[in-house]
């Protein structure tokens, strides 16, 4: 029996490793940590009996377990080979990493544009997503202006110490008027920048809705939801397989879950199942002739 490509839990584990830090642990591994825990069904004799024979040794240098909660063995990817959420695992001592300098590392892994590289460099993954710390001593313009205003306010009474001096009185009034104009200008600048920022945020949200397809929006909503979970259920989460434009790829899969074998089906670009394909069907489903590029 042909096995279905196990896509779901590889996506969940990689997404959590990137977004939360520590990798997800299997329930029976006994690994301690604060990361989320994935509870997989046991790989007993009944589950292993449903696996196809492992690949022969010459074409397969190393055997590894299926991604996620799968129980069967498959060929491991070698160093330098392309990898991602929907591919097989990298070999021992290797980890799937986004290309160096990739501006969107998580999307690169979802698109299968990662590279199997030495695991000692895997700690760099989080650096792609962590925002740069603010430079020390960087204050806002309004804080600097307030400091200047405070210094000017402290110096202002000195102009009143000269008795019966009309010249100093005129200068004092001029200074007060100038300061008032400066504060009004700063207040207008802050209000204008705030309105401009709100307009840009609204425009970016509108642009996201129009540019990203339904599959991409579902995937991002699911990954955002995973940030707040401390425990994952293999039955409760589905991460779709999206193309580069954010629409659904023709082939969607559910992974193996211990005793329960995975399955695949074909959909259109909006995620609707195509007629003639049984969603619960077993074995491999060939949608490649219709695969969107």
UniProtKB/Swiss-Prot annotation:
Gene3D superfamilies in UniProt: 4.10.40.20, Thyroglobulin type-1
An example molecular function term from Gene Ontology annotations: fibronectin binding
Residues that bear Phosphoserine: 150, 203
GO cellular component terms, semicolon-separated: extracellular space; nucleus
Signal sequence, renumbered to the chain: 1-27
Segments of skewed composition (Polar residues): 193-204
Glycosylation site residues: 118, 138, 201
Basic and acidic residues: compositionally biased ranges: 178-192
Disulfide bridge map: 40-69, 43-71, 51-72, 60-75, 83-96, 90-116, 215-242, 253-264, 266-287
Location(s) in or outside the cell: Secreted; Nucleus
Region (Disordered): 132-166, 178-213
Family annotation (Pfam families): IGFBP (PF00219), Thyroglobulin_1 (PF00086)
Annotated ranges, domain Thyroglobulin type-1: 212-287
SUBUNIT field: Interacts with XLKD1. Binds IGF2 more than IGF1. Forms a ternary complex of about 140 to 150 kDa with IGF1 or IGF2 and a 85 kDa glycoprotein (ALS). Interacts with humanin; humanin competes with importin KPNB1 for binding to IGFBP3, blocking IGFBP3 nuclear import and IGFBP3-mediated apoptosis. Interacts with TMEM219. Interacts with RXRA; this interaction modulates the transcriptional activity of RXRA. Interacts with LRP1; this interaction mediates cell growth inhibition independent of IGF1.
Function: Multifunctional protein that plays a critical role in regulating the availability of IGFs such as IGF1 and IGF2 to their receptors and thereby regulates IGF-mediated cellular processes including proliferation, differentiation, and apoptosis in a cell-type specific manner. Also exhibits IGF-independent antiproliferative and apoptotic effects mediated by its receptor TMEM219/IGFBP-3R. Inhibits the positive effect of humanin on insulin sensitivity. Promotes testicular germ cell apoptosis.
Protein name stated in the entry: Insulin-like growth factor-binding protein 3
Gene expressing this chain: IGFBP3
């Amino acid at each position: 029996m042909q096995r279905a490509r196990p896509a779901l839990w590889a996506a969940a584990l990689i997404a959590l490793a990137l977004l939360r830090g520590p990798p997800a642990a299997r329930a029976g591994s006994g690994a301690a940590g604060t990361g989320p825990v994935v509870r997989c069904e046991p790989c007993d004799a009944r589950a292993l009996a449903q696996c196809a024979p492992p690949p022969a040794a010459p074409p397969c240098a190393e055997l590894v377990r299926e991604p996620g909660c799968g129980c069967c063995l498959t060929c491991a990817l070698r160093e330098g080979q392309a990898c991602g959420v929907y591919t097989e695992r990298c070999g021992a001592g290797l980890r799937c990493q986004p290309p160096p300098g990739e501006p969107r590392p998580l999307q690169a892994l979802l698109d299968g544009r990662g590279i199997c590289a030495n695991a000692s460099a895997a700690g760099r993954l989080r650096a792609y997503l962590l925002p740069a710390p603010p430079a020390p001593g960087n204050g806002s313009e309004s804080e600097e202006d307030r400091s200047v205003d405070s210094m000017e306010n402290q110096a202002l009474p000195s102009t009143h110490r000269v008795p019966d001096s009309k010249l100093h009185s005129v200068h004092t009034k001029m200074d007060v008027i100038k300061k008032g104009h400066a504060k009004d200008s700063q207040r207008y600048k802050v209000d204008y920048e705030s309105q401009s920022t709100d307009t840009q945020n609204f425009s970016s949200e509108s642009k996201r809705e129009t540019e990203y397809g339904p599959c991409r929006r579902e995937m991002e909503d699911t990954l955002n939801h995973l940030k707040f979970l401390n425990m994952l259920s293999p039955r409760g989460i589905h991460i779709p397989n999206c193309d580069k434009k954010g629409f659904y790829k023709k082939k969607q899969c559910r992974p193996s879950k211990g005793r329960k074998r995975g399955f695949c089906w074909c959909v259109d670009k909006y995620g609707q199942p195509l007629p003639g394909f049984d969603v619960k069907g077993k074995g491999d489903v060939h949608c490649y002739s219709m695969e969107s590029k």
